[in-house]
């Protein structure tokens, strides 16, 4: 299995602090609601992008998790601008505020400054109680120049949120199945229940984007939620195709192509656990035959 994996970290939930936990929006869910924000991400107009995202969250109240596309503040940047740190700090403050007001987690990627003039394509998962988790994109799209300025992440990150274990992934990671491979740990527990992807997949890669998320759901016996952008920029056009996918491979909810929309669906954790118990295929992975 991939090395450098962080132990699933909880979003502030403690069974001994139930009253405080419920007040801050941290509690165990049997059925979890996820909303994908499929947006036309405007080039370098971070204020407008955050304003649109705020309105989208207001139009879809009551979700446990709101998922945004890749680099939702600026659109996809291969060369980070000088004001990247300023944009990053304001955007992260915005995520904290939205998580608190919506009593839900807010998740999406943006440019994050690193030491020595480098950057990360960083996905933040901000919980209602203010807890922040992050994952740095591991597979950089070198064909598009992403590898010049960005530092690849070296660890997978799994967040334990309202009873669901959620693996954080970004766009191009989708094409590397071993990086997101699910497994059974030493205590017999399956590592994660849901993969969330912030994406910036172009229309030219339509077939891959339609196929790969379904494959990831089936092979890992998990739900997949993937938020993609629409619109166009200097790199091409984007059609959306944001979806929530069942472990069987069925589509639970899907956005309208080439339209801004909020895509909401539910995931059933008890049903997932029953399915895995009935068909325990993850126990049959033979790692030493390949690694």
Describe each region flagged by the PLM:
Residues 6-7, 24:
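Polybasic, lysine-rich low-complexity intrinsically disordered segments
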Residues 90-107, 174-261:
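CN hydrolase (nitrilase-like) catalytic-core segments centered on the catalytic cysteine
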Residues 30-36:
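Extreme N-terminal starter segment of soluble prokaryotic enzymes
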Residues 108-110, 122-125, 157, 242-244, ...:
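Short beta-strand scaffold segments in enzyme catalytic cores
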Residues 114-190, 204-211, 274-281, 291:
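Active-site catalytic loop in hydrolytic enzyme cores
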Residues 46, 51, 55-128, 133-134, ...:
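Cys-nucleophile CN-hydrolase/nitrilase-fold catalytic domain and related Cys-dependent amidase chemistry
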């Amino acid at each position: 299995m991939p090395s450098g994996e962080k132990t699933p970290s909880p979003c502030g939930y403690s069974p001994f602090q139930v009253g405080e936990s419920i007040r801050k929006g941290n509690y165990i869910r049997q059925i979890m609601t996820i909303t994908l924000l499929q947006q036309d991400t405007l080039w370098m107009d971070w204020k407008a992008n955050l304003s649109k995202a705020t309105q989208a969250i207001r139009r879809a109240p009551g979700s446990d998790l709101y998922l945004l596309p890749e680099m939702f503040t600026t659109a996809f940047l291969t060369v980070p601008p000088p004001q990247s740190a300023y944009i990053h700090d304001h955007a992260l403050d915005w995520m904290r505020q939205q998580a608190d007001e919506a009593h839900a987690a807010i998740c999406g990627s943006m440019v994050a400054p690193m030491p020595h003039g480098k950057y990360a394509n960083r996905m933040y998962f901000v919980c209602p109680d203010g807890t922040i988790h992050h994952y740095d994109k591991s597979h950089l799209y070198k064909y598009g120049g992403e590898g010049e300025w960005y530092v690849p992440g070296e660890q997978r990150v799994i967040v334990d949120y309202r009873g669901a274990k959620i693996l954080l992934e970004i766009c191009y990671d989708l094409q590397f199945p071993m990086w997101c491979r699910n497994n059974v740990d030493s205590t017999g527990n399956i590592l994660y229940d849901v993969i969330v992807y912030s994406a910036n997949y172009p229309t030219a890669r339509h077939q891959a984007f339609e196929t790969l998320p379904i494959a990831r759901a089936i092979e890992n016996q998990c739900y997949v939620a993937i938020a993609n952008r629409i619109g166009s920029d200097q790199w091409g056009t984007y059609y959306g195709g944001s979806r929530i996918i069942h472990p069987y491979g069925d589509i639970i909810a899907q956005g309208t192509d080439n339209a801004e929309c909020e895509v909401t669906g539910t995931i059933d954790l008890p049903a997932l656990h029953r399915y895995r118990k009935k068909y325990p295929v993850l126990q049959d992975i033979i790692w030493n035959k390949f690694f």
